[in-house]
Curated annotation (Swiss-Prot):
Predominant subcellular localization, coarse grouping: cytoplasm
Annotated source species: Prochlorococcus marinus (strain MIT 9313)
Organism placement in taxonomy: Bacteria, Bacillati, Cyanobacteriota, Cyanophyceae, Synechococcales
Gene Ontology molecular functions: adenosylhomocysteinase activity
The protein's name: Adenosylhomocysteinase
Protein residues bound to substrate: T67, D142, E202, K232, D236
Signal peptide: none
InterPro entries in the record: Adenosylhomocyst_ase-like_sf, Adenosylhomocysteinase-like, Ado_hCys_hydrolase_NAD-bd, NAD(P)-bd_dom_sf, S-Ado-L-homoCys_hydrolase_CS
Compartmental location: Cytoplasm
Function statement: May play a key role in the regulation of the intracellular concentration of adenosylhomocysteine.
Alphabetical list of PROSITE patterns matching this protein: ADOHCYASE_1, ADOHCYASE_2
Swiss-Prot/TrEMBL GO biological process terms: L-homocysteine biosynthetic process; one-carbon metabolic process; S-adenosylmethionine cycle
Catalytic activity: S-adenosyl-L-homocysteine + H2O = L-homocysteine + adenosine
Binding, NAD(+): 203-205, 237, 266-271, 289, 324, 345-347, 390
Length: 476
């Protein structure tokens, strides 16, 4: 592994990548080639915009899981003219052969599977540091860590007390990394912040952070909420999780899902896909929800809607998918049955109170699979240390569904980079006609043929023949 730099001055002297093993590049390239055949949206954008180079001049700081599918995204951005630097947004989600292949192509990549928290924040800093002393002008984010780093760092420039009281292990590493950077360059973050033309955000949790900044008047640049494009949230979040959740659980444990009792906490799009996946393999699935509408949806689908504290001792497989924190707390963990499997498919690692288990005996079974002995003598199986199980214990969503999400990301980057002056410092979603375009680009691959409206039919329902076909408020 290449050493992490300790000062900005050393950047140009170091190789512009940090990967586990650059010799994995050939393996990664073979898988990239296969993934491209399953990602028609991204390939269509290369064909449509490749000669125009609409991202020429864009310097994109990318913080998103460094997987094979992300490699196809990165190479699409480059094909459209962008300069790109990349880090993963999760310490366990990198596929090392994917990182090696992209690094070998000349794109600066800073990502390894199983990073420490110190390494994670060092690598996130590296995507903000161009070797020529320049700065990024765009951020492509997943979970909001890159955006949040810039914002918190700029606050710390004028008031270092914001770094005084870290609330957990992750904040301890984050705050230390900011202090180190400020000691080298006291205006680093504000300089980055002023150079950013726009941010595109991939996931629910990161979008929530953006809306919080907008509400408080602190958002300093326009942002596009990619997550709430229909072709992202109703496909990636639902159908992606429907396949990748059980993939992660079974790779980690080899457990028979049929006959088990599973509890999915949260019944949004991610929870819906997760519940379907477990039911599809024969589990008895229950749902925990705070939202009466989501709870009613779950009940109408035939799931029992329950409270965690009333069923915790009966559950074999726990899955958190809420985007909240302290969902499974210490009081729940210590009551779990012997060999209960505990995992999370929400973005951050604080849905499960893993920190409260640190003083109990841990036995590592294999990477991202730990046996923890409770005071009762029961053992639980914790997957990916409470981080994303589908990426920590498997390889994430399939290429086809990620093509939907990443096609939205590319369109959002083009929109903000080329038309950023037309946007206020607010959070936007992509217009409906682009959402429909993303869907169209994926139909032929799966043999779907659209029916076409006649002009008379279109006039009858007051829509254009070519769409969009639904109003913005329509719920799919």
């Amino acid at each position: 592994m290449v050493a992490v730099p300790t000062s900005t001055a050393s950047l140009q002297a170091l190789p512009q990548y940090v990967v586990a093993d650059i010799d994995l590049a050939d393996f990664g390239r073979k898988e990239l080639s296969i993934a491209e055949t399953e990602m028609p949206g991204l390939i269509a954008l290369r064909i449509k915009y490749g000669s125009e180079k609409p991202l020429k001049g864009a310097r994109i700081a990318g913080s998103l899981h460094m997987t094979i599918q992300t490699g196809v995204l990165i190479e699409t951005l480059v094909a459209l003219g962008a300069d790109v630097r990349w880090a993963s947004c999760n310490i366990f989600s990198t596929q090392d052969h994917a990182a090696a292949a992209i690094a070998a192509s000349g794109v600066p990549v800073f990502a390894t599977k199983g990073e420490t928290l110190d390494e994670y924040w060092a690598y996130t800093h590296r995507i903000l540091e161009w070797g020529d002393g320049g700065t990024p002008n765009m951020i492509l984010d997943d979970g909001g860590d890159a955006t949040g780093l810039v914002m918190l760092g700029s606050k710390a420039e004028s008031d270092s007390s914001v770094l005084d009281n870290p609330g957990n292990e992750e904040e301890t590493a984050l705050f230390a990394s900011i202090r180190t950077k400020l000691a080298e360059d006291s205006s680093f973050y504000s300089r980055i912040k002023s150079s950013i033309q726009g941010v595109t955000e991939e996931t629910t949790t990161g979008v929530a952070r953006l809306y919080q900044m907008q509400k408080s008047g602190e958002l300093p640049f326009p942002a596009i909420n990619v997550n709430d494009s229909v072709t992202k949230s109703k496909f990636d979040n639902l159908y992606g999780c429907r396949e990748s959740l059980v993939d992660g659980i079974k790779r980690a444990t080899d457990v028979m899902v049929a006959g088990k009792v599973a509890l999915v906490m949260g019944y949004g799009d991610v929870g819906k896909g997760s519940a379907q996946s477990l039911r599809g393999l024969g589990a008895t699935v229950m749902i925990a929800e705070i939202d009466p509408i989501c709870a009613l949806q779950a009940a109408m689908e035939g799931y029992r809607v329950v409270r965690l504290d009333e069923v915790v001792q009966d559950v074999d497989i726990f899955v958190t998918s809420t985007g909240n924190f302290q969902v499974i707390r210490h009081e729940h963990l210590i009551r779990m049955k012997d060999e209960a499997i505990v995992c999370n498919i929400g973005h951050f690692d604080n849905e499960i109170d893993v920190a409260s288990l640190k003083d109990y005996p841990w036995e590592n079974i294999k990477p991202q699979v730990d046996h923890i002995t409770l005071p009762s003598g029961n053992k639980i199986i914790l997957l990916a240390e409470g981080r994303l199980v589908n990426l920590g214990c498997a390889t994430g969503h399939p290429s086809f569904v990620m093509s939907n999400s990443f096609t939205n990301q590319v369109l959002a980057q083009i929109e903000l980079f080329s038309k950023g002056d037309q946007y206020a410092d607010q959070v936007y979603v992509l217009p409906k006609h682009l959402d429909e375009m993303v869907a169209r680009l994926h139909l032929e691959k799966i043999g779907a043929r659209l029916t076409e409206l006649t002009k008379q039919q279109a006039d009858y329902i007051s829509v254009p023949v070519e769409g969009p076909y639904k109003p913005d408020h329509y719920r799919y």
